[in-house]
From Swiss-Prot:
UniProt-listed GO biological process terms: isopentenyl diphosphate biosynthetic process, methylerythritol 4-phosphate pathway; terpenoid biosynthetic process
Record's catalysed reaction(s): 4-CDP-2-C-methyl-D-erythritol + ATP = 4-CDP-2-C-methyl-D-erythritol 2-phosphate + ADP + H(+)
Binding site for ATP: 90-100
Function in brief: Catalyzes the phosphorylation of the position 2 hydroxy group of 4-diphosphocytidyl-2C-methyl-D-erythritol.
Positions of the catalytic residues: 8, 132
SUPFAM superfamilies noted in UniProt: GHMP Kinase, C-terminal domain, Ribosomal protein S5 domain 2-like
Classification of source organism: Bacteria, Pseudomonadati, Chlamydiota, Chlamydiia, Chlamydiales
Class of this enzyme: transferase
InterPro entries: GHMP_kinase_C_sf, GHMP_kinase_N_dom, IspE, Ribosomal_Su5_D2-typ_SF, Ribsml_uS5_D2-typ_fold_subgr
Protein name: 4-diphosphocytidyl-2-C-methyl-D-erythritol kinase
GO MF terms, alphabetically ordered: 4-(cytidine 5'-diphospho)-2-C-methyl-D-erythritol kinase activity; ATP binding
Length: 288
């Protein structure tokens, strides 16, 4: 069985302050995108995991094995399984690669063993696997509140396009939040639905990302786009309405900017509640 394990973007992320448990209260807009890893699952005589493009992730601490352990505890099924992952999502990129793998693995196990777990059950289990893991059991568009793990599904479609810019070095989420200062946080009465409050602390830690954003702002200056950081980084992204591509002049400028910058062009992706994210998305599997 084969499954797309999609990346996600934070279209905005607001930090509302520090909680009593020392975590930060946030509100964020999650969006699944048509780019990600490919997971293959089969029943086997022994447990195994192969990760193409990232063999250093073939460890017992991989998020996939955490899903397997949780599934086994919950269902009592202990049949060995074999995983093959074609890794495209960079580690520490702010794209939730590990969380997406965990969610996709949980869904895949439910499918292959026909255990009939509902989305609600899997979403509840996913809360034990990571803050943004439950999001992937939405339709692909949702608000995340509390620490980001409480999901409010959004039904409206987004007609956007995104250009992704990866970094050779990731950013640890814990390090990014540890660098947050009170002045970085948003007012509950004045939320901006395009900004990421983690940008300032991350840019203090990573001057190269700040400079890269300025370079992108200059490159895309003639186009009506938004440029931001997703999650705690290190991925930057350009966002623009898809309708721009219907204008030949804009389309040519977009193509030129994407080519000159070496970005990866992708789109939103939605999930049917009765299935998983489509593995047949051309842009999602272009690199596999």
């Amino acid at each position: 069985m084969h499954f797309l394990s999609p990346a996600k973007l934070n279209l905005f992320l607001q930090i509302l302050g520090r909680r009593e448990d020392d975590f930060h209260e946030i509100v964020t807009r999650y969006q699944a995108i048509a780019f990600g890893d490919q997971l293959s699952l089969s029943i086997s005589s022994r447990d195994s995991l192969q990760v193409i493009n990232a063999c250093h992730l073939e460890t017992p601490s991989n998020s996939i094995w955490k899903s397997v352990a949780l599934f086994r505890r919950y269902t009592g099924i202990t049949t060995p399984v074999s995983w093959r992952v074609v890794k495209q999502i960079p580690v520490g990129a702010g794209l939730a690669g590990g969380s997406s793998n965990a969610a996709t693995a949980l869904f895949a196990l439910n499918q292959i063993f026909k255990t009939g777990l509902s989305d609600e059950e899997m979403r509840s289990l996913a809360e034990q696997l990571g803050v943004d893991t439950p999001f992937f059991f939405s339709t692909g568009a949702a608000l995340g509140v509390a620490r980001g793990e409480k999901i409010i599904a959004l039904e409206e479609s987004v007609s956007d396009r995104y250009v992704l810019y990866f970094s050779s070095e990731g950013v640890l989420t814990s390090r990014a939040f540890a660098a947050v200062q009170p002045s970085d946080c948003s007012s509950r009465k004045n939320l901006e639905y395009t900004q990421n409050d983690l940008e300032k602390p991350v840019f203090r830690l990573r001057l190269d990302l700040k400079e890269k954003k300025h370079w992108l702002e200059n490159l895309w200056a003639e186009l009506p786009v938004h440029i931001g950081l997703t999650g705690s980084g290190a991925t930057l992204f350009v966002r623009y309405p898809e309708i721009l591509e219907e204008d030949l002049s804009y389309a040519a400028q977009i193509q030129r900017a994407v080519t000159l910058s070496g970005g990866l062009l992708t789109s939103p992706i939605r999930r049917d509640p009765t299935a998983w994210y489509s593995i047949y998305s051309e842009s999602a599997l272009a690199a596999t």
